[in-house]
Amino acid sequence: KARDMGITLLVVTNGASNDTSKKRDQLSSLGLEFSNDEIISSRDAAEVFLSFNKPEGPLGVLGNIGNKFTIPDLECVELEQDYSIFEEMSSFILLGTTMWDTMWQDMLLNSLKDNPRPLFVANPDIVAPHENKFSIEPAYFISHLIANGAHLPFWLGKPFPTIFELALN
């Protein structure tokens, strides 16, 4: 009904592990119909931000479970649990924590402490509600990195401006 009245509807979400089509399908399964253009995710915000603010050298991608994370003219490397690969990265982006564990946490912390580099965090949530539980989200783990000596990251999702600027455009 809102659309019939000329009201623009947007979903602004911190979901970054998957691409927009997965979020659209998830909303559709709940009876909520949105087009890809009506969904603005923190993954979208990260892609736009990094397209205009490309870090030098390869970007290590952490927490991606959806389609490949790509930025034009930037080497994006899906990281595995191999510390030597971490050392080859010039910066990192954390998309989500679905598969995160203490090994990932320790490798990222040690890599950033040994060689400080930019860390971009697409999803700045600490926890997220689900039907029967709460999930632990990237900001929870990042807070432990900071407490243990890692530099502050670049936050790209809600409540930070990048995602809202994207939604308003």
How does the language model describe each region?
Residues K1-N169:
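HAD-like aspartate-dependent phosphatase fold
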